[in-house]
Amino acid sequence: MAESMLSLPTPLNISIWWNMGSILGMILGLQLLTGILLSMHYSSQLEMAFSSIIHIIRDVPGGWFLRLLHANGASLFFLFMYAHIGRGLYYQSYIIHPRVWMVGVTIFLVSMATAFLGYVLPWGQMSFWGATVITNLLSAVPYFGPSMVEWVWGGFSVGHATLNRFFSLHFLLPFLISGLALLHIIFLHDKGSSNPLGNLFHLSKKPFHPYFTIKDSVGFLMVFGVLLMITFFSPSLLLDPENYISANPMVTPTHIQPEWYFLFAYAILRSIPSKLGGVVALLMSILILYFLPLSSYGKSIPVSMNIIYQVLFWILVVTFIILTWLGACEIEEPYLSLAGPLTLLYFLMFLLLGMSNNLNFNLIQLK
């Protein structure tokens, strides 16, 4: 297996955007290591959860460092995952490698679930209220909703049973992500890596080792350096200050919001007046990635020759960034009015991305 990976024929012209996958693998390994070490000192007892985090920071040798590496590592993991998905979208990997794309989207979904469960574990104010608000979305499911919420909570409110099962699932899911990542790599080896030109010819390829292992090592060092700088100099940059306050069911935070990497979906959820409609839009904002391989009917034109596709892609990127900003804003005007049209634009761009290939293909045939 290792020999197969090292001798993988890799295109000579791949850019830095092809480094994201290996960087994600490194961060996943780091998250597994720090997570296992932290779990040795964490207590999922309702009365002890917040105190155990304080204990890790104050009393465990290097505990503060492990916790901050784990928390900020999750943010970097999603940052590079979005860059990885963006590269796949831009260079149309969903057409060239549909199975790789499908497994990748599944990894993304499981990662989001894992991150949400981990966000609840410190049992701070935002942990408690975030868990209450997000799990309560299940009540929008017709007929079965209220029963599903109580089943997830393990009672009539978020409490000890909720925290216990969230801790168990948060511990298990990263191993599922690792298995899916291995499947992702196996499917990638079926055709080999794509490149900016979109061809899969083996004439201009070199073995992965040593050329690209050295290149990836540079990326590892740079990313690890950035993670250390954030951890040492600005540890709370990507964290929510509300979570430094112990959970109190009697005091509601002024603004309940998830971590920054979920804000685009949160903005889409809030933009729909109907609760059920908002939940459906929230799910579809991610599940729509599954439908991309079906949208182009196997016709792939190199992105350098498809100006329409490039314009649509960058409109989607800008829309995503603005939705992320809106998700962090208060629930008031003009932010609510902006979220509606941008949600529509977000879904429209995915539809047009698939159609643009066929449109461009027909225009070329006409010429």
Curated annotation (Swiss-Prot):
Task: Relay the cofactor remark from the entry.
Answer: Binds 2 heme b groups non-covalently.
Q: Which cofactor does it need?
A: heme b
The keyword Transmembrane helix is assigned to this record: yes
Chief localization class?
mitochondrion
Q: Which GO terms describe its molecular function?
A: metal ion binding; ubiquinol-cytochrome-c reductase activity
The UniProt entry, under Pfam families, shows: Cytochrom_B_C, Cytochrome_B
GO CC annotations on file:
mitochondrial inner membrane; respiratory chain complex III
- Binding residue positions for heme b b562: H70, H170
Q: Which residues bind heme b b566?
A: H84, H184
* SUPFAM superfamilies attached to this UniProt entry: a domain/subunit of cytochrome bc1 complex (Ubiquinol-cytochrome c reductase), Transmembrane di-heme cytochromes
Against CDD domains, the record matches this protein to:
cytochrome_b_C, Cytochrome_b_N
- Is-annotated flag, keyword Ion transport? no
InterPro entries in the record, alphabetically? Cyt_b/b6_C, Cyt_b/b6_C_sf, Cyt_b/b6_N, Cytb/b6-like_sf, Cytochrome_b, Cytochrome_b_C_euk/bac, Cytochrome_b_N_euk/bac, Di-haem_cyt_TM
Where a ubiquinone is bound, by residue? H189
**Compartment(s) where it occurs, according to its Swiss-Prot or TrEMBL record:** Mitochondrion inner membrane
- Which BP terms from GO are recorded? mitochondrial electron transport, ubiquinol to cytochrome c
Q: According to Swiss-Prot or TrEMBL, what is its membrane topology?
A: Multi-pass membrane protein
Give the residue spans that cross the bilayer: 20-40, 64-85, 101-121, 166-186, 214-234, 276-296, 308-328, 335-355
* Job description of the protein: Component of the ubiquinol-cytochrome c reductase complex (complex III or cytochrome b-c1 complex) that is part of the mitochondrial respiratory chain. The b-c1 complex mediates electron transfer from ubiquinol to cytochrome c. Contributes to the generation of a proton gradient across the mitochondrial membrane that is then used for ATP synthesis.
Q: Which family does it belong to?
A: Belongs to the cytochrome b family.
Remaining remarks: Heme 1 (or BL or b562) is low-potential and absorbs at about 562 nm, and heme 2 (or BH or b566) is high-potential and absorbs at about 566 nm.
The subunit structure is: The main subunits of complex b-c1 are: cytochrome b, cytochrome c1 and the Rieske protein.
Listed name of the protein = Cytochrome b
The upper taxonomy is: Eukaryota, Metazoa, Spiralia, Lophotrochozoa, Mollusca
Q: Which gene encodes it?
A: MT-CYB
